[in-house]
Amino acid sequence: MKVKLDENLPLRIAIELRARSHDVQTVREEGLTGRADADIWQASQHEGRILITQDLDFSDSRKFQPGTHHGIVVIRLRSPSRQNLIARANKLFDTEDVSGWGAVLSW
């Protein structure tokens, strides 16, 4: 699966997803840190990637209508520690096949 990991998530998630044979690019590794959401979104869609983020700006399903993109996963936790974020991302990929969702998911 092709994934773009936003800058607000630990790089460890990328490492663990790559170990599961996912094609992961990160905002940090691509030099997009600090860029506007529109730039991150455009890069993600141009590359055909699901965007994984904590940024609530991407959770608006009116702006990001299901079926019009490759997918968005917005991870929201009460306690968003590094360890908890990694655990949630791992759980998502352990329990769901998010390829082809084309929807916004707050998880």
Can you annotate each of these PLM segments?
Residues K2-I50:
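N-terminal first-folded block
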Residues L11, F58-D60, S81:
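Glycine-rich nucleotide phosphate-binding loop and flanking beta-alpha elements
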Residues A14-I15, S61-K63, N84:
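Short glycine-/acidic-enriched loop or helix-start segments at secondary-structure transitions
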Residues R20-H22, D39, K63, I72, ...:
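Solvent-exposed interaction patches of small proteins and small membrane subunits
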Residues R28, D55, I75-L77:
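Short beta->alpha connector loops at strand-helix junctions that form conserved
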Residues Q42-S44, T68-G71:
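Short, hinge-like loop/turn segments at secondary-structure boundaries
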Residues Q45-K63:
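Acidic, metal-binding active-site segment of PIN/NYN-like and related structure-specific nucleases
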Residues H69-W107:
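C-terminal structural segments of small proteins and small subunits
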